C-alpha cells in the first residue's frame, strides 16, 4: 500500500506507528482512570498508608495494562 503524502511533503504515520500510539494513549487513559477510581476501592476495603499507595499504583497499572491493548487493537483495525 503506498504511503500518502500530505500537502507539505509530510508522510502519514505507518500502521505500526498508529498501533503504538493507540497503545500509549490507552495506557495513559487507563492509568488516569485507575488514579481516579483506585483510591475509592482501596479506601473501601480499609487500606491505609504505604499499603494504600501500593494499592493505588497496582490499580493504575492494571487498568492501564487492560485498556492499552484494546486501544492498540482498535487502531490496528483502522489501518
From Swiss-Prot:
The primary location reported for this protein is mitochondrion
Q: Which UniProt keywords apply?
A: Antibiotic, Antimicrobial, Membrane, Mitochondrion, Mitochondrion inner membrane, Transmembrane, Transmembrane helix
Q: Which InterPro entries match?
A: Romo1/Mgr2
Query: Where do the record's region annotations for Sufficient for antibacterial activity lie?
Result: 42-60
Q: Which domain of life is it from?
A: Eukaryota
According to the record, the segments passing through the membrane are 22-44
This entry carries the following GO cellular component terms, namely: mitochondrion; TIM23 mitochondrial import inner membrane translocase complex
As for subcellular location, the record says: Mitochondrion inner membrane
GO biological process per UniProt = cellular response to reactive oxygen species; defense response to bacterium; positive regulation of reactive oxygen species metabolic process; protein import into mitochondrial matrix; protein insertion into mitochondrial inner membrane; replicative senescence
Q: How does it sit in the membrane?
A: Single-pass membrane protein
Q: Does the keyword Mitochondrion apply?
A: yes
Family, per the entry? Belongs to the MGR2 family.
- Physiological role: Has antibacterial activity against a variety of bacteria including S.aureus, P.aeruginosa and M.tuberculosis. Acts by inducing bacterial membrane breakage. Induces production of reactive oxygen species (ROS) which are necessary for cell proliferation. May play a role in inducing oxidative DNA damage and replicative senescence. May play a role in the coordination of mitochondrial morphology and cell proliferation.
How is this protein named in the record?
Answer: Reactive oxygen species modulator 1
